Amino acid sequence: MQRLWVTGYRSYELNVFGDKDPKIIIIKYALKNYFKGLLENDQLDWIITGANLGVEQWTAEVGLELGQKYPLRTSIMIPYEKFADRWNENNQTKFLNLKERVDFFASTSNLPYQNPVQLRNYQNFMLQHTDRALMVYDTEHPGKSKYDYNLIQKYQKAEEYPLDLIDFYDLQDVAEEYQEAHQRNYFSE
């Protein structure tokens, strides 16, 4: 069984403040292409991600979409109970919708947020229950995901644990590829 931890930027770190932002289309396109490459080589059974607004929720959406065509399951893990309680109503609704649709949902702590140990326990759980990681993350532009990135780097010194990055250069390439593909489709209709 091949399990992939996916994490990355929060939506606000990418200046994405609405569901219609074109950056979301490009990031989802990049994720979908990455996942399809693994799926077509029998290297992916589970996508395991968090519930943060941004890359993690977009990952769950793409995983659910691909799960209709491929033998792929999607899991959302959260570091503590009542994770989304402080979010606005729209974001809470999106969270609850994803929670209901994924193949597996759980919290690594049965308590509401108490202290940073819960976050470290969550990270350790993700490392120990996955075989590799993908981050939408650029080391030249650190964000909150730098903690995950640094922990994975440290973990790799003791364990074989592949980490792939989709950075801003990759996203620019994907945007150009997406635009070309959609222009071809437009003109061929």
Curated annotation (Swiss-Prot):
Highest taxon listed in the record's lineage: Bacteria
Family annotation (InterPro entries): YspA
Coiled coil ranges: none
Any one Pfam family match given in the protein's UniProt record, by short name: YpsA
PANTHER family named among the record's database cross-references: UPF0398 PROTEIN SPR0331, UPF0398 PROTEIN YPSA
NCBIfam families tied to this protein: PRK13660.1
HAMAP family according to UniProt: UPF0398
Membership in a protein family: Belongs to the UPF0398 family.
Listed name of the protein: UPF0398 protein lhv_1265
Protein species of origin: Lactobacillus helveticus (strain DPC 4571)
Biological classification of the source: Bacteria, Bacillati, Bacillota, Bacilli, Lactobacillales
